[in-house]
A protein has these predicted regions:
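Catalytic pocket-lining loop regions of alpha/beta-barrel enzymes
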Residues: 104-106, 118-220
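Active-site neighborhood of phospho(di)ester-bond hydrolases with catalytic His/Asp-centered motifs
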Residues: 2-5, 39-41, 81-82, 108, ...
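Divalent metal-dependent hydrolysis catalytic cores, especially in the metallo-beta-lactamase
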Residues: 25-52, 78-83, 104-109
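Short, flexible/disordered intra-domain loops and linkers
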Residues: 14-19, 46-58, 143-151
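Active-site environment of divalent metal-dependent phosphoester hydrolases
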Residues: 10-13, 45-48, 86-90, 114-115, ...
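Mid-to-C-terminal alpha-helical segments outside catalytic/metal-binding sites
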Residues: 1-9, 14-38, 209, 213-220, ...
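Conserved, mostly hydrophobic/aromatic
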Residues: 6, 30, 67, 99, ...
Length: 266
């Protein structure tokens, strides 16, 4: 089994006219490399009618409903994260409840608020209530602010994780750019923070450093927007790990932190 813990899809209310082909191409590429399940989110309108990193409540509702529709259309291949904006706290909690009722298995937070902000506490409590992991967009060692987003770094995510030790948090895209050593140092001794290996970065020594920092038990495989570099990292991990260790990264760790029966038995 191979679980992509960080995937994305599009809808008709996003800037891409080729959104259907993009969605189909992800599934085709996943078949080629052996992905069993794509655990995915849709980030509002991807900037069409509200900012990607500050999506409106209406855009999130539509995106999450379309994510559930994809789940229903591909029940053996797709699972959904509920995407929420913590600035709309009560709405976010309601969306999580709707998502759980519709079979979604995690929470997706992007860059609408720093991860150590108290506004995220009700979301973390809702995740704990429903046994959902939280995938949080992270800029590896933020050096400056970017327009239209409040990007978080690993230190800020760990502050949230310390406040909610019963919630499993996923540090998104270690290979997404920036100082991943800073991130690994921050998460080393925070056992409820897992690291997803997605992102286009494939720096020499990154995977070895990740294994040294958090061990194979807290690594999750993922791709983010494209599959090619995720596949490259998986092939390299196969040269570093035993078969059982590789299976942990491929699917066993994900199966342990997502809700029971979220994935087919293996």
């Amino acid at each position: 089994m191979l679980i992509d813990t960080h995937a994305h899809f599009y809808t008709d209310r996003t800037p891409r006219a080729d959104w259907q082909e993009r969605n189909a191409s992800r599934l085709r590429a996943g078949e080629r490399v052996g992905i069993t399940i794509h655990v995915a989110s849709i980030l509002g309108s991807w900037g069409l009618t509200s900012p990607t990193y500050f999506p409106s409540a209406a855009d999130l509702e539509y995106a999450n409903e379309q994510m559930r529709a994809l789940q229903r259309a591909h029940p053996h291949r797709i699972r959904g994260y509920v995407a929420v904006n913590p600035n709309y706290t009560r709405h976010a909690v309601r969306e999580i409840e709707r998502g759980v009722a519709g079979g979604m298995i995690g929470v997706k937070l992007a860059a609408s608020r720093r991860s150590d902000d108290p506004l995220l506490d009700p979301i973390a409590r809702a995740a704990a209530e429903h046994g959902l992991p939280v995938l949080h967009h992270i800029w590896q060692h933020r050096r400056r602010d970017f327009p239209g987003q409040e990007a978080s770094d690993a230190v800020e995510l760990c502050a949230l994780a310390h406040r909610h030790p019963g919630v499993r948090f996923i540090l998104a895209h270690l290979g997404g750019g920036g100082d991943w050593l800073h991130s690994l140092h921050a998460v080393r001794d925070v056992p409820n923070v897992y690291v997803d290996l997605s992102g286009s970065g494939v720096d020499g020594g990154m995977l070895e450093a990740c294994l040294a920092a958090v061990g194979v038990e807290r690594l999750l495989w993922g791709c983010d927007l494209t599959i090619d570099t995720g596949w490259a990292k998986l092939r390299y991990l196969a040269t570093l790990l035993s078969a059982d260790e590789l299976h942990r990264v491929q699917w066993k760790n994900a199966a342990a932190i997502f809700p029971r029966n979220a994935f087919p038995p293996c």
